[in-house]
Amino acid sequence: VRESGATALHYLGVLPAILLNIPENKNDKNHSVKFGFGAGVNPKHHALFEKRFGFPLIEAWAMTESGAGGCIAASHEPRHVGNCCFGKLTDKVSIKLIDENGHEVSEGAPGELLVRATGDNPKYGFFSHYFKNEAATAETWKDNWLHTGDVVRQGEDGSLYFVDRR
């Protein structure tokens, strides 16, 4: 990273833990990185990583099926570092959180994340279908909502927190 002059990087959740296991070095902050973008950093490593390496890890939620149309990112303060927060909705994305029976959960309760584009075309920016698998497509897109299988809760300020996979 230092040699490339990169100013942004993409990370997977395990990478901060791996880098934190490397012995500290006086050059840990000697780079041009302004931020990292990814998902799944262990809450106990998030603040430690940012302090040691000197740049924020911007947590986000997306999946292949959501494409760019459903990406949600913690790109605005407060980011709620260290508790699996992946940001707030934008005006381009709508969500619902449902229980195992398909009913919306009460405020603050965890539920499966359903997501779609806001506006006339709920699939705008999302995947169109699974290749040669109409049944799987129908199972994933129900009633114009993408069923993600991710369990999420929404905080009082609208921030979204990853809880688990269904």
Feature map (PLM): residue ranges:
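Active-site glycine/GP-rich loop and adjacent strand/helix microenvironment
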Residues: 72-75, 86-88, 104-109, 128-130
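Gly/Ser/Thr-rich phosphate-binding loop
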Residues: 2-12, 20-80, 94, 101-104
